[in-house]
Structure formats: structure tokens, C-alpha cells
Amino acid sequence: MSHLDYEINKELGECYLFMGEYGKARDYYTKAAECDTSCSDPYLGLAAIAVHEGNYKDALTFYTKANQVSPGEKPLTGMGMIEIEQGNYAKAFEHFAATLSFNPGNMLAVNSLVQLGYVLNRLTDVLPYLEAALGPGDTEAVRYTLAACLMSTGRKDAARRHLEILLGENPANTGAKELYAQLAA
């Protein structure tokens, strides 16, 4: 089969997935995967179908296959979400951490990692990922979260520095004001 067959089947799979016709979408994604085993998109589509159908075991299998074919943030994020759904928090933590090695600004992964850091008592492990997410763009929420995590890990001076930066940039930030007041108390 040709690359054109792959593209047609993949596009039809996407269309049927969007329309909620999962059986047809599955058929076309399966055909696309058979046409070109070096592309991860059909496996991501099959994973999405499995999620919609509540079949998390198959979803994890397809996300894993997609990540084997083409490692990246999409399959790793999907794997992390499924692991959370199944209660495998330590595995989810590792998947989201790996996601952030591809894109430190992936906010779904950042937020999930923070939540898992609290659940697993691994906030110290989360700090480098939050610091890496302080790249260009709107980092107010990330900086606030970093300050809160620093406070929770007993690093009050570092938390204070980040809150001062926040309040310097946005003196009306009520969350930063409240957290700063807690530090002062």
C-alpha cells in the first residue's frame, strides 16, 4: 500500500472519530496503521477511541505502541492520564515527567505532575519541572504553583523570591498576596 493510502485512511479515521462513529474510525485507523507502521497517529486515534469507549487497557496499549513508534509528548501524556485513571500514580508521574522532557510547557503534564507530587509525597521531585516551565510566555500560574510547592517543602526563602517577582509584575495578584502573607506570619 502507498503513503497516499495511509493518509486517506488516517484522515477518514479522524473524520469518523470527530463525528463519534467509533466503529468506522477504528476500521480506518487500523487500515492506516497497516499501511505505515512507522507513523504513530493511527495508534493515537485508536487510543482516543478506546478512551471514549472506557476501555483503558486498550487505550494504554495503543498509547504505548504510539510511543514506541514515535516517542513524544502526546503518547506520554495519554499514558499518564490512563495510569491516573487506573490508580497507577507512580507510573503516571514517570510518564508526565517524560512528557516534560519533550515540552517543558505542557500545562496538562505540569499540573498533573504537581497533583501527583502531592499524592506521592514527591513535591521535591516536581520542583525542577516547574522551574523548567518558567520559560517565555505567561508564567504567572506556574510561578505561583512553584512558590506554593517551595513553601510546602520548607524552602520559604525561595518561595518568597518567586512571590516577590509575581507581585512585582502583578501587584493585584490576590493569590500571591495571600501566600506572601502566610510566609510573613
Predicted feature descriptions by range:
Residues 1, 35, 68-69, 102, ...:
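Structural marker of alpha-solenoid helical repeat scaffolds
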Residues 5, 39, 72-73, 106, ...:
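Residue-level recognition of tetratricopeptide repeat
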Residues 8, 42, 75-76, 109, ...:
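TPR alpha-solenoid repeat register
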Residues 10, 17, 44-47, 51, ...:
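Position-specific recognition of the canonical hydrophobic site in helix A of tetratricopeptide repeat
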Residues 11, 45, 78-79, 112, ...:
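Canonical tetratricopeptide repeat
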Residues 19-31, 53-65, 86-98, 119-132, ...:
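Structural signature of tandem alpha-helical TPR/SEL1-like repeats
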Residues 137, 149-185:
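Terminal, low-structured helical/coil segments at or just beyond the last alpha-helical repeat
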